[in-house]
């Protein structure tokens, strides 16, 4: 079941973020940061367990970023990430200040399958790059 994250989900969200951030596939987010931004997270819950996460970041020139998308590896290839991306697009476009949804990702095939197009990051506003300063790959970005 896909739903809005609750404060009680913060630790489960961080656990998935830590799993993916260990090998540089996702930016680390502290538990405090997650709690402060819990309203921006959506989770996929199965049998009472958070097995998927996604975060939307609003705010740059009518752009919305899908970020911190991750699914517990035990549940890969079941369409959960696809559902979460489709839900994120829907949520983002409900906001009248949004006309473009983007993502910086290694999961290129997933997003192309869902209609996203590859663009050069240079076309994104400089403000988008703030998170890049925390990334392990900032000097050799391959997203």
Where are the regions that the model predicts?
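Conserved beta-strand in the GNAT
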Residues: 43, 49-58, 62-70
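Non-catalytic positions within long, well-ordered alpha-helices that form the structural scaffold/packing
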Residues: 93-94, 112
């Amino acid at each position: 079941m896909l739903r809005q994250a609750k404060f009680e989900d913060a630790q489960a969200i961080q656990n998935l973020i830590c799993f993916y951030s260990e090998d540089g596939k996702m930016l680390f987010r502290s538990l405090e940061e997650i709690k402060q931004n819990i309203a921006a997270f959506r989770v996929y819950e199965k049998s009472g367990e958070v097995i998927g996460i996604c975060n939307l970041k609003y705010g740059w020139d009518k752009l919305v970023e899908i970020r911190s998308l991750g699914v517990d590896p035990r549940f890969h290839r079941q369409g959960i990430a696809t559902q979460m991306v489709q839900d994120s697009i829907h949520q983002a476009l409900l906001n009248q200040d949004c006309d473009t949804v983007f993502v910086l990702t290694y999961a290129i095939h997933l997003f192309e399958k869902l209609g996203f197009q590859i663009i050069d990051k240079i076309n994104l506003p400089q403000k988008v790059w703030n998170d890049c300063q925390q990334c392990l790959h900032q000097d050799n970005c391959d997203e």
